[in-house]
């Protein structure tokens, strides 16, 4: 049996789509040195090559892909988005605005200088910033502002061409900038990180190991009573000295949970909870007593839960204010916008932050009720909330403002982004509403993006040869300028106007570019994960601003030409 592959793919849009995705994802795993091509550029390259052979898919698949992607971006940004505006995120907001604004101005200027159309200009901006939200926002606005016809098709083709030509330039130049720019400035990055650590009491170990606490039991002997010297448990401060706390005491056969006024007596049997290394630091007077194996004394169900910060008595407060150890709980991680933060007693908690806490199940539940709620570990998505807010986003996108002879529509990109932010924000405040497992959200977001990239590549592939010869060199130079110059502008603005600590500043710059590989390099250079504080500060707002920049550059383009 002979199978004509070309006819088979042309006659089956779904098969063609998944062939493009599979080949593109394989290509995306290739590495150039230490740099991985990535899924987005892999799918785009494969779709452009197949597009040259006149393969095409239904444009509705492209539209659905970008809608799913941009909605999920909003959902991820929602929990921490508003804290950027209403609290101590002013510097991070200003840095993100400077980064996105300067890049957009440079792109508009270079587009006019070289005589490009809006498709090439917006595509170059998206590729240079390695930002698919720019590409999505620009593509949606093009469809809403240009009449269907050859001009719209040409602009959409050039949009994907500009992105494909400049993406690797933007990624490689930013990674090299992250590696060498810190060495060109006067302040040493590790020293800056240590300065923040001293000021805030931070743990600078970026590879902090996390263990579950363990429980062991001892019989109190004369040496331990002598060491206690008649002090009660509160006065002894055993946790401050050892990192362990006394969970239970058996005295005269009676098992009880001690309070701070309890005084140890010879013959008591005590259970201590702490990390393994904390047990090894116990005073010898503990270990000289006989270790006991009492089923009831050791019967404690240690759990690890993720607690979402929500309540007013925790939001805006320092981590030390929670006094988790006083409640018999251990803090393992602090996560903000899916970014692991340093364990810092002085860090100010935002609504939507996630604290990973270990301890006795009852104690962890009690702490969760005080500061927020335990994140649901369900694999079931609240599809009703997902679909309802998706519809709301589409309805918002239909809103059009009329100013004399000029009309401006919000568009699907901005509408879905806003609806996604609303859903994410409400999810961070109501534990049973709108739950979407992170794995499911990542899958929908990534799949939507890949479908969108496949669609734009197949649409643009037919005209790539003629366009590449005309603008290839201009694109490469422009991509380098738009990638690096805003980074330098942000550094100067942050260092000499905002006077930010360099470790936080470089982290914030990489967050404004939403580039995780460059962030890893900054952390390695600083020999600390302290730059993650700055990265988390700008990341959420930058994703939103980049989407809006894609729409705004299309709206402003006619005025630039005029």
Swiss-Prot record:
InterPro entries listed in its UniProt record: AAE_transporter (IPR050144), RCK_C (IPR006037), RCK_C_sf (IPR036721), Transp_YbjL_put (IPR023017), YidE_YbjL (IPR006512)
Pfam families membership: Asp-Al_Ex, TrkA_C
Domain RCK C-terminal: 202-288, 290-373
SUPFAM superfamilies referenced in this protein's UniProt entry, alphabetically: TrkA C-terminal domain-like (SSF116726)
Cysteine-cysteine disulfides: none
Keywords (A to Z) from UniProt: Cell membrane, Membrane, Repeat, Transmembrane, Transmembrane helix, Transport
GO CC field: plasma membrane
Claim: 4Fe-4S is one of the keywords in the record: no
One of the GO BP terms on file: potassium ion transport
Transmembrane segments: 8-28, 37-57, 66-86, 94-114, 118-138, 158-178, 383-403, 406-426, 447-467, 475-495, 541-561
Compartments where located: Cell membrane
GO function term, MF aspect, one: monoatomic cation transmembrane transporter activity
Membrane topology, from the record: Multi-pass membrane protein
UniProt KW Transport keyword: yes
Family classification: Belongs to the AAE transporter (TC 2.A.81) family. YbjL subfamily.
PANTHER family xref list: K(+)_H(+) ANTIPORTER SUBUNIT KHTT, TRANSPORT PROTEIN YBJL-RELATED
Protein name: Putative transport protein YPO1326/y2857/YP_1266
Lineage of producing organism: Bacteria, Pseudomonadati, Pseudomonadota, Gammaproteobacteria, Enterobacterales
């Amino acid at each position: 049996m002979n199978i004509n592959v070309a006819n088979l793919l042309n006659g089956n849009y779904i098969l063609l789509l998944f062939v493009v995705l599979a080949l593109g994802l394989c290509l995306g795993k290739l590495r150039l040195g230490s740099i991985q091509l990535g899924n987005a550029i892999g799918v785009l390259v494969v779709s452009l090559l197949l597009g040259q052979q006149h393969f095409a898919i239904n444009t509705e698949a492209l539209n659905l892909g970008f809608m799913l992607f941009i909605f999920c971006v909003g959902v991820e940004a929602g929990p921490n988005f508003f804290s950027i505006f209403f609290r101590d995120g002013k510097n991070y907001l200003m840095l993100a605005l400077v980064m996105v604004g300067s890049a957009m101005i440079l792109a508009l200027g270079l587009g006019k200088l070289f005589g490009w159309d809006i498709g090439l200009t917006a595509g170059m901006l998206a590729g240079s910033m390695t930002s698919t939200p720019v590409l999505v926002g620009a593509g949606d606005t093009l469809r809403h502002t240009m009449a269907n016809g050859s001009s719209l098709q040409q602009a959409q083709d050039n949009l994907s061409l500009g992105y494909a030509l400049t993406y690797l330039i933007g990624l490689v130049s930013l990674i090299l900038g992250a590696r060498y720019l810190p060495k060109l400035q006067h302040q040493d990055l590790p020293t800056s990180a240590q300065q923040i650590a001293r000021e805030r009491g931070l743990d600078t170990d970026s590879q902090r190991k996390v263990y579950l606490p363990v429980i062991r039991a001892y019989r109190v002997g004369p040496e331990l009573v002598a060491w206690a010297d008649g002090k009660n448990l509160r006065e002894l401060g055993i946790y401050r000295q050892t990192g362990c706390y006394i969970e239970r005491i058996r005295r005269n056969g009676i098992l009880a949970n001690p309070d701070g006024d309890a005084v140890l007596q010879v013959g008591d049997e005590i259970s201590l909870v702490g990390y393994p290394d904390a047990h090894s630091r116990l005073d010898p007077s503990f270990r000289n007593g006989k270790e006991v194996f009492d089923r009831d004394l050791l019967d404690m169900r240690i759990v690890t839960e993720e607690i979402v910060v929500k309540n007013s008595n925790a939001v805006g407060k320092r981590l030390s204010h929670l006094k988790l150890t006083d409640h018999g709980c251990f803090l393992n991680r602090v996560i903000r916008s899916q970014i692991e933060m340093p364990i810092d007693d002085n860090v100010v908690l935002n609504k939507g932050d996630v604290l990973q806490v270990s301890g006795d199940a009852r104690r962890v539940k009690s702490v969760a009720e005080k500061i927020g709620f335990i994140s649901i570990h369900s694999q079931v998505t609240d599809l009703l909330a997902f679909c309802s807010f998706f519809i709301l986003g589409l309805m918002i996108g239909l809103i059009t403002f009329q100013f004399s002879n000029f009309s401006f529509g919000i568009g699907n990109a901005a509408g879905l982004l806003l609806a996604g932010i609303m859903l994410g924000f409400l999810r961070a405040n109501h534990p049973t509403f709108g739950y979407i497992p992170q794995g499911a959200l990542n899958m929908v977001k990534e799949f939507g993006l890949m479908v969108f990239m496949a669609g734009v590549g197949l649409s643009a592939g037919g005209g790539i040869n003629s366009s590449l010869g005309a603008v290839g060199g201009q694109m490469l130079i422009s991509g380098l300028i738009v990638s690096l110059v805003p980074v330098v502008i942000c550094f100067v603005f942050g260092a000499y106007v905002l006077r930010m600590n360099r470790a936080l500043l470089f982290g914030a710059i990489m967050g404004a570019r939403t580039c995780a590989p460059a962030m890893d390099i900054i952390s390695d250079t600083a020999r600390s994960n302290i730059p993650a504080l700055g990265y988390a500060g700008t990341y959420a707002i930058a994703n939103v601003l980049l989407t809006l920049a894609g729409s705004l550059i299309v709206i402003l383009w006619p005025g630039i030409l005029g």
